[in-house]
Amino acid sequence: LASSAASDVYKRQAEHWKGQTGQGVEVIQSHGGSGKQALEVANGNEADVVTLALEYDVKAIQDAGLIEDGWINEFDKDSSPYTSTIVFLVRKGNPKNIKDWGDLVKDGVGVITPNPKTSGGARWNYLAAWAYADKLYNGDETQIEAFIKKLYENVLVLDSGARGATTSFVENNQGDVLIAWENEAFLSVQENPDEYEIVTPSISILAQPSVAVVDDVVDQRGTRDVATEYLSYLYSDEAQRIAGDNFYRPSNPDILNEYADTFDLNINLVTIQDFGGWDEVQKKHFDDGGVFDRIYELSLIHISEPTRRTPI
């Protein structure tokens, strides 16, 4: 969850826990790129619970021996209490007339998106763009890769996480379009309604953040009960509405329908299973030497102004 939503949930859950047990709860939060956060936890930065951008990042902590097998079935909806999707945030009036993914590869369009090597949200961005190109070119991977390469040639800043990318676009005034989590885009418009607007592409992806108890840590600290209760609380009607109020899509379909005036519920969404699941996606696209590395290296070669690109 973004920090604003997380703080609200933690406060409500702490009140709920104290009412049930009489115990107070102190919550220490860490926010950043999902892949980077997962690596830090796997390398010993203790966390009782994780809420990460994608299943694969939780599996990285599992592979380090800190989360037990079967975590994805511990909570409802494959341990995904809320979802999101990928949209475009553009400047007010949409001066570059950006309407779909195809507009992001046009000359003169500056794109902001995070680095999929470090950001879970950026992987969703990449896959949503791939889904568009896959449909456009009827699965011809040579043409799909050429499309993705052109898109990354237009990327001005490759931040390590989604929040950093938003900062580059909003605060640093870089780029014409931010490929963004839907919730981040809505928050930017809410905070600056006269400066930005949202464009929903013709096709996107169902982004499913994952939550898990870090078993090794909670067993050592004796915090399993409160950690499990916190993640269970995310599925309560109250927490689902907090998620919706912060522009995440509640996993409870009845509560999601309460936000029909906020979200485009008819958007064409592919899922990670359309790509064969995260293991296959990671190996093909994001592992060292994968498709993204090849495309990004080629896109760097074709940049005429080296100072345009600022990988972070």
Q: Where do the PLM segments sit?
A:
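Short beta-strand->loop
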Residues: S3-S4, V90-K92, V109-Y137, Y152-V155, ...
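Ligand-binding pocket segment of bilobal, Venus flytrap-like solute-binding proteins
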Residues: L136-S202
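Extracellular/periplasmic juxtamembrane helices and adjacent flexible linkers that interface
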Residues: V218-L300, S304
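N-terminal segment of the mature folded domain
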Residues: S3-T118
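Sec-exported extracytoplasmic/periplasmic mature domains
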Residues: A14-G22, A42-E46, E55, Q62-L66, ...
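Short, small-residue-biased leader/transition segments that mark boundaries at the very start
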Residues: L1-Y10, E305-T307, I312
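Periplasmic-binding protein-like
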Residues: S80-T85, E145-Y152, L158-S160, E191-R224, ...
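Short helix-loop capping/hinge motifs at secondary-structure junctions, enriched
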Residues: G93-K99, T118, A131-G139, V217-D225
